[in-house]
């Protein structure tokens, strides 16, 4: 329905306008705060919000653990839907692998400046971006395809992975590259034998984050997949409106367990890399 699509586009523009207004207010407050700089005398005083912040930081993991135990108690023996589990695993693994390749190519060959637009998916509302992707997929007759859903996930996976890899890439010691070139190494050999091993731990972290970001995607999966590519997230949201409690708990528990297992494996691999390669600690 064209009228409904126009209403959706108008709602997306309204969200963008609200975000722009909030950004202007925050920028004005920051500029106003800079006019009243504190008296920097080198004397430290206890921060009044330190204790509440520490308590909140301690309670957040505990609340997540309690939520996982509650889901495990509700799920009991209800198995997850295998097609949703397979789609979630396939999309997440493919998205983080392609995202890592895109990020490494961007860092190695991309422009040094003018890349601020890469971070837009991290600050803009998800609805306008997903709506734009959906319209492109409709115009190209690609909606309902698995690879289209993967493309939709990459819009959010790549910025998050680049957010982790970019600082580590910039902190590389350029003297190692100079020494390697004096020994006659080419760019390809330097990348595979010198640069990539030095990025082992941040690359593993980026892969885990990209995996979890892909698992959590709902709007791109639903719209670009046209409802024909079920995942754990889409099934959990659908069941939350009136499904069986045990099945909903099982879907949500698997949605929690998959990123947890991925983070555990990457932490173990990072520990092994630091154990057998002291320079990567």
Segments predicted by a language model, with ranges:
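Short cytosolic juxtamembrane segments of multi-pass membrane proteins
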Residues: 35-43, 270-281
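Short glycine/proline-centered loop/turn elements that form peptide/ligand docking sites
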Residues: 172-176
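Intracellular loop-helix junctions on the cytosolic face of multi-pass helical membrane proteins
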Residues: 29-53
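Short helix-to-coil transition segments within interhelical loops
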Residues: 178-199
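Short alpha-helical segment that forms part of, or immediately flanks, the ligand-binding pocket
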Residues: 118, 177-178
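Conserved adenine-binding aromatic site and its adjacent loop/helix in ATP-hydrolyzing domains
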Residues: 87, 178, 234, 238
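Glycine-rich helix-loop "coupling/hinge" segments at transmembrane-helix boundaries
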Residues: 1-3, 216-246
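Membrane-water interface segments at the C-terminal ends of transmembrane alpha-helices
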Residues: 8-27, 49-170, 194, 198-219, ...
């Amino acid at each position: 329905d064209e009228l409904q699509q126009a209403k959706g586009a108008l709602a997306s523009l309204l969200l963008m306008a609200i975000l722009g207004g909030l950004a202007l207010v925050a920028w004005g407050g920051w500029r106003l705060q800079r006019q009243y700089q504190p008296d920097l005398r080198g004397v430290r005083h206890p921060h009044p919000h330190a204790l509440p912040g520490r308590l909140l930081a301690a309670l957040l993991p505990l609340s997540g653990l309690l939520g996982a135990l509650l889901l495990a108690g509700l799920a009991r023996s209800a198995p997850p839907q295998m097609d949703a589990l397979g789609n979630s695993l396939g999309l997440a693994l493919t998205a983080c692998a392609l995202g890592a390749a895109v990020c490494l190519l961007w860092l190695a060959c991309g422009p040094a400046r003018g890349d601020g637009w890469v971070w837009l998916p991290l600050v803009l509302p998800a609805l306008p971006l997903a709506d734009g992707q959906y319209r492109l997929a409709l115009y190209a007759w690609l909606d309902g395809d698995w690879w289209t859903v993967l493309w939709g996930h990459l819009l959010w996976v790549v910025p998050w992975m680049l957010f982790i890899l970019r600082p580590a890439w910039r902190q590389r010691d350029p003297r190692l590259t100079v020494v390697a070139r004096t020994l006659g190494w080419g760019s390809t050999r330097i990348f595979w034998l010198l640069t990539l091993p030095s990025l082992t731990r941040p690359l593993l972290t980026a892969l885990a984050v990209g995996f979890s970001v892909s698992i959590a995607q709902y709007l791109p999966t639903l719209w670009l997949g046209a409802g024909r590519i079920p995942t754990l997230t889409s099934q959990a949201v659908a069941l939350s409106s009136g499904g069986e409690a045990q099945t909903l708990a099982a879907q949500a528990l698997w949605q929690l367990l998959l990123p947890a297992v991925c983070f555990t494996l990457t932490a173990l691999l990072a520990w092994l890399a630091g154990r057998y390669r002291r320079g990567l600690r």
